[in-house]
C-alpha cells in the first residue's frame, strides 16, 4: 500500500496501552519466539498474546476446566485458535486435504467454518503452533492479518452460478486482500524461519501501516446482488458489484461504516449499517481501499478502543466530511451510486448449475462445525470428497460449504459420496434452522458470557415447535446468536437476534431486515429461555394471523409495533416498549 502525507496519528505516549504496545513491538515481533520456547507454561506472555492476533492466532483456554485446575493449583488449560486467511472463502481440494490433516493432528479433530468465509482451528497447543502454520504454508495458505488491528479477511459472494461475474469480482477481492494486509516480515521470520532483513536494505517494513497499524480491525467485503450473503452493510468497507445488461462487471458502489460490535450498558457503543457513498470503476478499487483505510488510520480513535472502529470515526466527523476526505485522497470525486437490489442474505442450498454448465452443491453445515458425529461424519465425508474432487470448495458467509466446479462426469461420484455420508440436509430440516447462525462462544472464547454454538440448535428445536403450531415451519426466518455483545455472528441484523448476557441469559432482538438492510432492536433484556419462547410464541402467532402477502417476519415485527425501526446506529440503544400485546421488555 502507498503511504499518505496526512498521518494524523498522535505520538504513542498519548495513546492507549494497546497503541503503545504496537509501537514498541518491533513490528509485531515482540518476544513471541521467546514465549514459544518457554517450556514452563502452555501460554505466551500477555503482551505477546496481543501481538499474536496480528499473526492470526488467539490465546484461549478451556473455560470448563478453569475451576478444577485452579483447585489443583494448575495454570489454565491454555490452547490457541488459529484463523486462516482465505480471500473470498475459496480453497482447492489439495488445500482442503491439508486443512483436514492439520485439524486431525493438532485441532481436536475439528474444523470451524466462520462467518467471514474461512477456517478456524481450535484446541491447538503452543508447541504445535509452528507445525500448524508451516503445514498451511505447504499449500500456500497463511494466517496473516486474520485477526488484529488491520484489514481482516476479505469477503466475496460465494454464489458460483454467476460464473463470469463471480470470477471477475473474486479476482478483484483477492487482489484487495493481498494488497491490504500488512507486509509482516515478523510472520515470515517466526513461523517460516526466514532470516531478518535489515530495514535499510528493504525499505520501511510497513509503508502503509507504520508502527501502530490501524486503531482497530477493519473489514472489507465484495457482494454481488441480489444475494447479500456477506452482509455488506456490516462491513467497514463494502463493494457492491454492478453489472451491465450483458452481465459484465461495470464497477462497484462503495459502502462505508458498517460494524456489529457493541458493549452492554455502554450506550456510546452500537452496531451501525454502512452508508453507500458512490460508485467506482473496477480499476479504482485498490486506490479506494487505500483512501478509506488511510482515513481510518489517520482519524480513528486511538485513545479509547471501545470507540476505535471506523463507524465511530464517521459518526464523529460526519459522513460528508469523511467522504470528502476519501475523495481528496483519491484525487477524484466518486460517481453517483447506481441502482441495485438485494432479496436475501442466505445461501441457495442443494444443487445448482452455473452459466458455464458446471455444477455446484451447497451443503448446510450447522453453525459451521465440521466434526464426525454419530450418523453425520462431516469431516470424514468432506475429506473423501476432496480426494476425488477436481474443482474448488467455497466457504459461505453463512458458515456453509459449496462443492464447486463439478463436471458432468464427476457429478455421479460426488452424489454417491453425499449419500454415503448423509451430507445433504433433508426436506425435514426447517427453514429457520437453515437460516440460523451462531458464533463459537463457550468453552473456548474468552469473551463469551453465555453459550451460543452449543445451545442454538437446541433453542431452534423449541422455536420449530412454535412454528409448527402456527403453520410457519417453511417460512424463512433468520435467527442468529452470539455469546457476547461483540456480535461475531452478525446478530443485530437478524430477524431474531440473541446475544449472551450471563449463563442461560440473553438479550432478544427483533425486527432486522431479511436481507441485512435494517438493524433490529432489543425487546427482552437478560432473559431466560422461558421468557424468550413466550414472547416469540406471541409474535409468531400474530405473524401467522395478520401478515401481509410476502411479508417477512422482521418487517412484520416493525409494522405490528413490537419494535420501532432503527434508522441510525446511534439510535440502536434507545429502548422502545413492545406493543401489539407483547410482554414487558424485561424478564
Swiss-Prot record:
Binds 1 siroheme per subunit. Binds 1 [4Fe-4S] cluster per subunit. It catalyses: hydrogen sulfide + 3 NADP(+) + 3 H2O = sulfite + 3 NADPH + 4 H(+). Disulfide bonds: none annotated. SUPFAM superfamilies: Nitrite and sulphite reductase 4Fe-4S domain-like, Nitrite/Sulfite reductase N-terminal domain-like. Siroheme binds at residue 488. [4Fe-4S] cluster binds at residues 439, 445, 484, 488. GO terms for molecular function: 4 iron, 4 sulfur cluster binding; heme binding; metal ion binding; NADP binding; sulfite reductase (ferredoxin) activity; sulfite reductase (NADPH) activity. This is Sulfite reductase [NADPH] hemoprotein beta-component. It comes from Bordetella petrii (strain ATCC BAA-461 / DSM 12804 / CCUG 43448). The lineage of its organism: Bacteria, Pseudomonadati, Pseudomonadota, Betaproteobacteria, Burkholderiales.
